[in-house]
Amino acid sequence: MFVPVLVLLAACGASRIEPGNVAVGTWGGVEAGLLVRADGAHAHIGCTYGDVTGPIPFDADGRFDVAAQWNVSAFPIDRGVFHDARMSGRLGGRSLTFSARLGDTGQVLGPVMVTLGREPTMANCPICRDPKARARATAPRSRDAAASAGTP
């Protein structure tokens, strides 16, 4: 008798949403930020940051997983070395939890939680507001490309 009730409660608790793209805007949290544009996104986890090209699509469970380029050596001196990475997470209403996993080392950054319309609160590292203002080449350099060019 209890099993059907539990199954019914579990089904009612499952929150499915219409698949789509993460909303354009500023998503902020403690030591985290996600600046979403129609053509991509810029994310910060602590003193690291990454870029996503294109929209961030999510499924009916709010889950997403997209390719990114991630810089883990941005502070105190940004050397402009980017790693291929995956940014993944889950959207839940106006909040979103995400992390980044570097492809070459497997290092995981996060997870962090951000909220749409909230300003990021960064303690030591400022968030990059304008991608064009960042002092780096427009094409991300991978760690392997930097090593072959003789850059530490």
Question: Where do the protein language model's features map onto the residues?
Answer:
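N-terminal glycine/threonine-rich, aromatic-flanked beta-hairpin/loop signature
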Residues: 30-72
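Bacterial N-terminal signal peptides that target proteins for export
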Residues: 1-3
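Short, solvent-exposed mixed-charge patches
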Residues: 149-152
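Surface-exposed, polar helix/loop patches in the mature regions of secreted/periplasmic/lumenal proteins
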Residues: 82-128
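An anionic, turn-rich surface loop/hairpin at beta-sheet edges
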Residues: 66-90
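C-terminal motif of bacterial Sec signal peptides marking the signal peptidase cleavage site
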Residues: 10-11
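Tryptophan-anchored aromatic micro-motifs
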Residues: 17-33, 66, 98-100, 121-147
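A short, polar/proline- and glycine-enriched secondary-structure boundary/capping micro-motif
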Residues: 52-56, 75-79, 106-114
